[in-house]
Amino acid sequence: IDWLKLGKMVMDVL
């Protein structure tokens, strides 16, 4: 799991 990409996706959603 790419946590950096996951975190970026979360930030984009918020």
UniProtKB/Swiss-Prot annotation:
Belongs to the MCD family. Mastoparan subfamily. It is found in: Secreted; Target cell membrane. Antimicrobial peptide. Is active against both Gram-negative and -positive bacteria (Escherichia coli (MIC=38 uM), Pseudomonas aeruginosa (MIC=310 uM), Staphylococcus aureus (MIC=19 uM), and Bacillus cereus (MIC=38 uM)). Also causes moderate mast cell degranulation (ED(50)=100 uM) and low hemolysis (MIC=50 uM), and exhibits chemotactic activity for polymorphonucleated leukocytes (PMNL). Expressed by the venom gland. The modification Leucine amide is found at L14. The keyword NADP does not apply. InterPro entries: Mastoparan_peptide (IPR013214). Its main location: secreted. GO terms for cellular component: extracellular region; membrane; other organism cell membrane. Keywords: Amidation, Chemotaxis, Cytolysis, G-protein coupled receptor, G-protein coupled receptor impairing toxin, Mast cell degranulation, Membrane, Receptor, Secreted, Target cell membrane, Target membrane, Toxin, Transducer. GO terms for molecular function: G protein-coupled receptor activity; toxin activity. One of its GO terms (biological process) is venom-mediated mast cell degranulation in another organism. This is Polybia-mastoparan-III.
